[in-house]
Curated annotation (Swiss-Prot):
SUPFAM superfamilies named among the record's database cross-references: Cysteine proteinases
GO biological process per UniProt: muscle structure development
Domain of life: Eukaryota
CC annotations in GO: cell-cell junction; cytoplasm; cytoskeleton; striated muscle dense body
The name this protein goes by in its record: Lim and transglutaminase domain protein ltd-1
Domain LIM zinc-binding: 5-72
First-listed, main subcellular location of the protein, grouped into a coarse class: cytoplasm
Gene name linked to the record: ltd-1
SMART domains for the chain: LIM, TGc
PROSITE patterns hit by this protein: LIM_DOMAIN_1, LIM_DOMAIN_2
Organism: Caenorhabditis elegans
Length: 723
């Protein structure tokens, strides 16, 4: 008896991992084939419909296209075929006359029902296309698993031998050192206490043990990578042989050479919503473990429309699985779901190796690339002259081009309280937040953080040198997520000031960048110090926004190198008005070098943090500057600043600041007034000098914990002369 079950749509065998059914008519479908016969809409067991007019029609439909006529659509049948009965049925019911027009309507409905019952032209649907036979792939996986068993068994044996040899050598070393100490102690020649000797020997032992573990980890990772590379080639050979049977398959049978992609990532998709169904499958699969890579890939790719979808499913599954925090039982069996990830347990298999392995099971060409990265601990201006900042990532052939994937960085994405519309969710060993930037990253963006040892894998028309890689600005993924760019195309990671200690960094905002808010931090490059002579270094940076450019102008207070860290976040006007703290994430960093300083720099007045000028007031509060559109105001003893409101704001408060002057002494210098939709801020300065003006406002209905609180609106830098 043949126990194999086949998909009613595509006719191929279905397996438990992607099976839907049996349905009411005893049919089965692949998950990818379980779609409406007419429109291709994905169906569920609660939403699919059958053709009730034809029991021989085993197809499934959505509610909009199911070929079934309701009871009211059917013509009323004659009881004996006589004209009398027909007449009675059509015109007289219980002695009441029925409009003859109803008979015409019934005829029309009957014709419609007949048309509905006719088979629709079948849509073109590829279904769940598995190039390689399930049993064939499973057999190869079992052979690969046997090779892994042997490899990990050799790892364990060598670990035991190394541990025994280490303890033996360590014991001999301790015994020798203690014996020599005893001889010297008896002769009175020892200049060290026994406790100090034991402490010294312990430190030496820990260092040797750490070196042993590091070398062992590197060796085992290298051997595992070699094994996975060989197994991936064997799996791809299986796909190559199977693809030769399908003349219409466009995916190359052998990996093409590395060349720049034919199009950008944004030309393939612009929003992650494109992968919503794919991501849901990955989340579901991560919750429900499978016992083989063959089953895992068939489940992940069940609804895939293209090779991009398949790679996306693998990427999301890996980033959902919080591999770095998994806890493995020592008694874990190799043929269990968790046994699939034993390489993670042993520390021999990393994200990039696992990604390559899974890609081979899906028939995708994938390579592991080694090189440098501007990873944790890196600062702008650093040189890659040793083994620090070594990293590994992947390139996978998708949509006709090689595309970069960095699963490790995609999974380690940290989420701040106000970062986007949703917070990270975790469920045991699962995490649902990730960084989409590191999936199919454009080569022009990837080069800012990763430099391959083989220049060809930069995938750039004009590859960069290592020196150029060191010099280009140090940016993070959010820089590209927010679609930012630098005004100066020749800007480098190290910025040099002029003789007055001034240097500027300007960033162009995207067309719809009104919701972006920036922040910065300034500290000394060689330490965590952020003050000089008791003053915050932040007061030596002026941040301003004009039109679509945000500028950070640094005035170095000394020749000591500085580190400028620029942060950003996308915040709605409503969220900002609540006054709740906003969490920022770094978008770029710069080293600021002042080789000579001929002018003594004066710190800015101590105002609220953030940008100077009225641009924020316009973006977030709808205030239009009528009198002073720039951040800096040059005036005499008096000045009046005017705004026009585009939405109702109920109160304005102005606060004046000056270096070496108590703010309380300046309270009487400002007055605020509202007249219609106009806002007036009037200031009388007590003397010449540089002032900072903070302006606060609130909405009528703005309550925070039952209180009406003011929110910072904007600030000006004012130079008063001729007082």
């Amino acid at each position: 008896m043949n126990s194999k079950q086949h998909c009613n749509r595509c006719g191929k065998q279905v397996y438990p991992t992607d099976k839907v059914g049996p349905l009411k008519d005893s049919t089965f479908f692949h998950q990818g084939c379980f779609k409406c016969y007419i429109c291709g809409t994905r169906l569920a067991l609660k939403t699919y419909c059958n053709n009730r007019n034809d029991i021989n029609d085993k197809e499934v439909y959505c509610s909009n296209h199911v070929p079934i006529a309701g009871p009211h659509d059917l013509p009323m049948a004659s009881t004996n075929g006589s004209g009398k009965n027909l007449e009675n049925n059509n015109h007289v019911k219980n002695g009441n006359w029925i409009d003859a027009g109803l008979s015409d309507m019934k005829i029309a409905h009957a014709m419609k029902a007949t048309q509905v019952a006719r088979p629709y032209p079948k849509i073109s649907h590829e279904g769940a296309k598995y190039v390689v036979d399930y049993d064939t792939q499973t057999r190869l996986e079992l052979l690969h698993r046997k090779d892994e068993d042997d490899l990990y068994e050799s790892f364990q044996d060598k670990r035991v031998r190394e541990a025994e040899e280490f303890e033996k050598e360590n014991t001999e070393e301790w015994e020798k050192a203690l014996a020599e100490f005893a001889k010297k102690y008896e002769k009175g020649q020892s200049n060290m206490k026994k406790d100090d000797l034991i402490r010294q020997l312990t430190i030496k032992r820990e260092k040797k043990l750490e070196t042993l573990h590091t070398k062992r980890k590197e060796r085992e990772r290298h051997q595992t990578a070699e094994l996975v590379d060989r197994q991936a080639k064997e799996m791809l050979e299986l796909f190559k042989a199977s693809r030769s049977e399908y003349s219409n398959l466009q995916y190359p049978s052998t990996p093409p050479p590395p060349v720049p992609p034919s199009c950008s990532k944004r030309e393939i998709y612009t929003t992650t919503d494109y992968f919503s169904s794919i991501d849901e499958v990955a989340i579901h699969c991560a919750r429900n473990e499978v016992a083989s890579f063959t089953d895992l890939i068939r489940t992940l790719s069940s609804g895939a429309r293209s090779d991009v979808d398949v790679a996306r499913a693998i990427y999301r599954w890996i980033t959902i699985k919080n591999l770095n925090t998994m806890i493995f039982d020592d008694s874990i069996q190799n043929d269990t779901p968790m046994g699939l990830l034993r390489g993670i347990k042993y520390g021999t298999e990393s994200y990039h190796v696992l990604f390559k392995r899974l890609c081979s099971y899906a028939g995708l060409h994938c390579v592991v690339i080694k090189g440098f990265s501007k990873s944790a601990g890196y600062q702008p201006g650093y040189s890659f002259d040793d083994h620090r900042f070594r990293n590994t990532w992947n390139a996978v052939f998708l949509d006709g081009s090689w595309r970069f994937v960095q699963c490790n960085w995609g999974a380690r994405h940290l989420v701040n309280a106000k970062d986007g519309s949703h917070e990270a969710k975790t469920d045991g060993n699962l995490r649902y937040e990730y960084d989409d930037h590191y999936f199919m990253t454009d080569s022009e963006e990837f080069i800012y953080e990763f430099f391959p040892s083989d220049h060809a894998w930069q995938l750039l028309p004009r590859p960069l040198s290592l020196l150029q890689f060191e010099r280009i600005p140090f940016v993070r993924s959010l820089f590209f997520k927010y679609n930012l760019s630098f005004i100066d195309n020749k800007l480098e990671s190290t910025v040099y000031t002029d003789k007055s200690g001034a240097a500027s960094i300007s960033i162009r905002l995207p067309p719809k960048g009104d919701s972006l808010i920036f922040h910065y931090n300034l500290k000394f490059f060689d330490s965590e110090e952020n003050t000089i002579s008791g003053m915050s270094l932040k007061r030596f940076v002026m941040q301003s926004v004009t039109e679509d450019v945000v500028t950070f102008r640094v005035h170095a207070p000394s020749t000591r190198p500085l580190l400028l860290d620029i942060f950003a976040n996308s915040v709605s006007s409503g969220a900002y008005l609540t006054g709740q703290p906003i969490k920022f994430k770094s978008v770029c960093k710069f080293k600021v070098v002042c080789e000579s300083l001929q002018v003594i720099m004066v710190p800015l007045p101590e105002c609220a943090s953030g940008e100077w000028g009225p641009a924020k007031a316009t973006r977030l509060f709808g205030l239009l500057p009528i009198s002073h559109p720039d951040a800096i105001i040059n005036t005499g003893r008096y000045v009046e600043i005017r705004f026009r409101m585009t939405r109702p704001l109920s109160e304005f408060v102005a606060s004046l600041h000056r270096n070496r002057t108590d703010d309380r002494a300046l309270q009487a210098c400002t007055r605020s007034a509202l007249k219609g939709d106009m806002v007036y801020i009037q200031i009388e300065f007590p003397g010449e000098g540089q002032y900072g003006l903070d302006i606060y406002t609130r909405q009528d209905d703005q309550l925070i914990n039952g209180k009406q609180l003011l929110t910072h609106c904007c600030k000006y830098l004012i130079h008063s002369r001729n007082c």
